[in-house]
Curated annotation (Swiss-Prot):
GO terms for biological process: actomyosin contractile ring assembly; apoptotic process; mitotic cytokinesis; regulation of apoptotic process; Rho protein signal transduction; septin ring organization; signal transduction. Disulfide bonds: none annotated. Keywords: Apoptosis, Coiled coil, GTP-binding, Methylation, Nucleotide-binding, Phosphoprotein. The modification Phosphoserine is found at S22, S93, S219, S504, S513, S528. It comes from Rattus norvegicus (Rat). This is Rhotekin. Residues 296-403 form the PH domain.
Length: 548
């Protein structure tokens, strides 16, 4: 059965790739290939996980990849249908109609996500019962775009679930639907004993005794074959932990507000579910939207503006239409440098625009009148351009702005602030390997040399040179009986016999340095062998006179 499912899955992936190639959409094809590779890596990681937390992260990645692949499949299907309908529905005799005007796209950002919990008083206040933990995360989908939050561990000590991520969706229309899905899984192993290997079952039965061990062994064997047991929990699902959909909701343009707001959740879990959480049934978040017409200029050019009440021919300015304002600058460089405009003409949903021509002004014959009502008064500003094409471009930009304002509604009243999402925290670095001594910087103190001398004197009284008859069986020459300084071994030469000397870690020879990454103490001052207590003449003579 597993082989059949794997074959069908491979065929589906091949079909998706072929569909993407037929549409010649390199961007969508690149995204799809990336998610397929991520899915394969998540499957391999899940099979190699040994810790419960690692398996939860791998299962979360696999769930997100599957959701994105399904979303891209739906988008590919829609584009394929549109391509087929476009080829079959068009006739050579049909006249080419201009495309319908559509509202601009925008960015949607959701942040400050909070989901309150409703614990029982015996669990939260009296702290009674078993302490269970759950792993939860949010899956956010807007069109074909899917994002996820970090995995959060929840127990009864928390009053709400807090997600610190800011999810930004680009290329969103005013009719967007942002779906939020809350998934959860129990952190504790479910049915760990039921899925235990036979080796563990044998050890368990032998430790409990003959009669009790046989009953436990029979229970383990029956649970492994049938999937249930009268005394043990059911076996977990094959392939790792399983996330359950706990709640979901859908947010639209009506939920956009430049502030904190509460929304209802649709609960889909029950208390018998192992991943059940006592959700309050609502969530709090900040949902904002930025139409492109509010953040990017839609038209610009040279204008001659005659403000209301002016009797002169007007002022020559550089006009920039951005958002609901027509900014007028002295020069185009002032607009690029961000300087304050000379004056601003307001444009809102009640603004009236009228085009005309002036015969007495041959250089600026085309006019564009913008009228706004303030109370009972009506203020009209007249714009003059030099060509009909310039007049047409300004009229197109204003018509598009009116359409955007009618579709995006209150999002065009003022520019809502979108904070840049902070990067996710990288995994904690592993601790440095090595002893604590190698991580410490030891200062050169005089006490270190004194301690080294004491240790050397103690070890020197215990050391004995090798006997002379040992030279007959080894290649080492016998020790000369002369007590000259050359016959006394130094501490840098290893002795061929006896227990090796133990020196202080502070006195490390220069040719045995610990490397540049380890801090060691400087060498103690050199002293004579006699003062350090290595050997004495009395000790040597006593050794020569002692029997073998």
């Amino acid at each position: 059965m597993q082989d059949r499912l794997r074959i069908l899955e491979d065929l589906n992936m091949l079909y998706i790739r072929q569909m993407a190639l037929s549409l010649e959409d390199t961007e969508l094809q690149r995204k799809l290939d990336h998610e397929i590779r991520m899915r394969e890596g998540a499957c391999k990681l899940l099979a190699a996980c040994s810790q419960r937390e690692q398996a939860l992260e791998a299962t979360k990645s696999l769930l997100v990849c599957n959701s994105r692949i399904l979303s891209y499949m739906g988008e590919l299907q829609r584009r394929k249908e549109a391509q087929v309908l476009g080829k079959t529905g068009r006739r050579p005799s049909d006249s080419v109609q201009p495309p319908e005007r559509s509202p601009c796209r925008g960015r949607v950002c959701i942040s400050d996500l909070r989901i309150p919990l409703m614990w029982k008083d015996t669990e939260y206040f009296k702290n009674k019962g078993d302490l269970h933990r759950w792993a939860v995360f949010l899956l956010l989908q807007l069109g074909e775009q899917i994002q996820d939050t970090e995995m959060v561990l929840v127990d009864r000590t928390l009053t709400d679930i807090s997600f610190q991520n800011n999810a930004i969706f680009a290329e969103a229309g005013p009719d967007f639907e942002l779906r939020l899905e809350l998934y959860g899984a129990c952190v504790e192993e479910e049915g760990a004993l039921a899925g235990a290997p036979k080796r563990l079952a044998t050890k368990l039965s032998s430790s409990l005794g003959r009669s009790s061990g046989k009953r436990v062994r029979a229970s383990l064997d029956s649970a492994g074959g049938s999937g249930n047991s009268p005394i043990l929990l059911p076996t977990p699902a094959v392939g790792g932990p399983r996330y359950h959909l706990l709640a979901h909701t859908t947010l639209t343009l009506a939920a956009v507000q430049d502030g904190f707001r509460t929304h209802d959740l649709t609960l889909t879990s029950h208390e018998e579910n192992p991943a059940w959480l006592p959700l309050y049934g609502s969530m709090c978040c900040r949902l904002v939207a930025q139409p492109l017409c509010m953040t990017q200029p839609t038209a610009s050019g040279t204008l001659r503006v005659q403000q209301a009440g002016e009797l002169q021919s007007g002022t020559l300015v550089h006009g920039v239409l951005k958002g609901t304002n027509l900014f007028c600058y002295w020069r185009s460089e002032d607009a690029d440098s961000g300087q304050e405009p000379l004056f601003t003409i307001l444009i809102n949903k009640e603004t009236r625009v009228r085009a005309g021509e002036l015969e007495q002004a041959p250089e600026w014959p085309f006019t564009l009148s913008i009228s706004n009502r303030y109370g009972d008064d009506e203020v009209t500003n007249t714009l003059q351009v030099q060509s009909r094409d310039a007049l047409q471009s300004w009229m197109e930009a204003l018509w598009q702005l009116f359409l955007d304002m009618s579709q995006w509604k209150h999002c065009c009243d003022e520019v809502m602030k979108i904070e840049t999402p902070a990067p996710r925290k990288p995994p904690q670095a592993l601790a440095k390997q090595g002893s604590l001594y190698h991580e410490m910087a030891i200062e050169p103190l005089e006490d270190i040399a004194a301690v080294t001398d004491i240790l050397a004197q103690r070890e020197g009284t215990r050391l004995e040179p090798p006997p002379p008859w040992l030279a007959m069986f080894t290649d080492q020459p016998a020790l000369r009986s002369s007590c000259s300084p050359a016959s006394v071994p130094t501490w840098t030469q290893p002795l061929p016999w006896g227990r090796p000397r133990t020196f202080s870690l502070d006195a490390v020879p220069a040719d045995h340095s610990l490397g540049p990454s380890r801090s060691v103490a400087p060498l103690p001052p050199q002293r004579s062998p006699q003062s350090r207590g290595f050997y004495s003449k009395s000790q040597l003579s006593t050794w020569l006179q002692s029997p073998v």
